[in-house]
Amino acid sequence: MTLLMIFTILLVASSQIEGHLKFDIHDAQHYFETFIINYNKQYPDTKTKNYRFKIFKQNLEDINEKNKLNDSAIYNINKFSDLSKNELLTKYTGLTSKKPSNMVRSTSNFCNVIHLDAPPDVHDELPQNFDWRVNNKMTSVKDQGACGSCWAHAAVGTLETLYAIKHNYLINLSEQQLIDCDSANMACDGGLMHTAFEQLMNAGGLMEEIDYPYQGTKGVCKIDNKKFALSVSSCKRYIFQNEENLKKELITMGPIAMAIDAASISTYSKGIIHFCENLGLNHAVLLVGYGTEGGVSYWTLKNSWGSDWGEDGYFRVKRNINACGLNNQLAASATIH
C-alpha cells in the first residue's frame, strides 16, 4: 500500500466538521494500526505498544483541538504522533543556553548585537512576497533525527544560502562539524545559533557535509582546515519588538536563524499557524520568506525535521502576533568570506 493511499484512508476515515479536519476518537485504534504501517513503527512488546497507543490517542485529541482553533492551518497524524510533548522537545529540538562544564571558549570573536527598535521605514520598497527558495537559493530540508542539534541546522542553513547567493551554487555544509567541534555548545544536548557562528569564526571555517557527514551523535572532532568550504567573517544577534523589521534584514542579509517554542507544532501539516504556544524557547529554525495568503500575512520557516513533515519540511506562521515566541533576543545571521 502506497503512502498516498494510506493517507487517503486516514482522511476518509476522519470527518470534516465545519471545514476542520476531525478524527473520530472511537476509531483511534484503527488510526494507530494504520500509523504503525505507514511509519514502519516497531515496538518491542505489547506493553510498549499499548503505552504508545495511549499517547497516540491523546495526540489525536490534541490534533482535533488544534484544527478547531486554527482556521488557516491543518494538523494531522505524522511520524511524531506516538511521542509525548516532553519526548519531542527532549529529542527533536535542542535550543539551550546551557554551556558544557568543560567549555573552552576563545573571546576573540563575538556577534554584534543589533537593535531593531525603530518602526519600519515607510520609504523602503520591499516586495509583498519574498522567499529565498526562489531562484534555487535553499538546500534541501535536512532531518536532525533524535539529536538536539536544531541550533547547528539553523546556523548551517543560514550559511548554505549565503554561499548560494554569493556563488550561485548550492552546497551542503556540515552540521556534524559543529556537533563534534563546537566547545561552547552542547552537541546533541543543545546550543545557540549565534554561539555557533562565533565558534566558526574562531575555528576558521566550515567543511562540506560530504567531507564531514551527519551522524546525529557527538563524536571526535575531525576538522580539516584544508577542506573548509567557507569562513564566517561576522555575525549579528537581533533584538527587535516589531517583526516587520525582519523583512528588510531577511532580504539584505539572507535567512535568519530564529528561536521558537515548538511544543505545539509537531503535528502541523500545512497552512498558516495562528495559535501557537509561547511558553519557552526550545527550538531553532530558519526564517526564509514572507507573504500573504487569503488576507493572512505570514512568515515562512525552514525546519530540520525532514521533508516529510509540514509543507515539505517548511511551515508558516502568522506575522506580527509573536507566533511561537518569534519575538525574542536569539535571532541571528552572519556574513561569509
Curated annotation (Swiss-Prot):
Q: Give UniProt keywords alphabetically.
A: Disulfide bond, Glycoprotein, Hydrolase, Protease, Signal, Thiol protease, Zymogen
The glycosylation sites are: 172
Query: Coiled-coil stretches, from where to where?
Result: none
What EC number(s) are associated with this protein in UniProt? 3.4.22.50
Q: What class of enzyme is it?
A: hydrolase
Asked whether the keyword Glycoprotein is assigned, the reply is yes
Q: Which reaction does it catalyse?
A: Endopeptidase of broad specificity, hydrolyzing substrates of both cathepsin L and cathepsin B
List the propeptide region positions: 20-126
- The organism's superkingdom is given as Viruses
Please list which residues make up the signal peptide.
Answer: 1-19
- Per the UniProt record, one Pfam family is Inhibitor_I29
Recorded protein name is Viral cathepsin
One GO term in the molecular function aspect is: cysteine-type peptidase activity
Q: What organism does this protein naturally occur in?
A: Adoxophyes honmai nucleopolyhedrovirus
One Gene Ontology term of the biological-process aspect is: proteolysis
> What is this protein's function?
Cysteine protease that plays an essential role in host liquefaction to facilitate horizontal transmission of the virus. May participate in the degradation of foreign protein expressed by the baculovirus system.
What does the PTM comment of the record read?
Synthesized as an inactive proenzyme and activated by proteolytic removal of the inhibitory propeptide.
- Keyword Disulfide bond present in the record's keywords: the answer is yes
Entry similarity comment: Belongs to the peptidase C1 family.
Show the disulfide pairing: 147-188, 181-221, 276-324
Q: Which gene encodes it?
A: VCATH
Q: Where is the active site?
A: 150, 283, 303
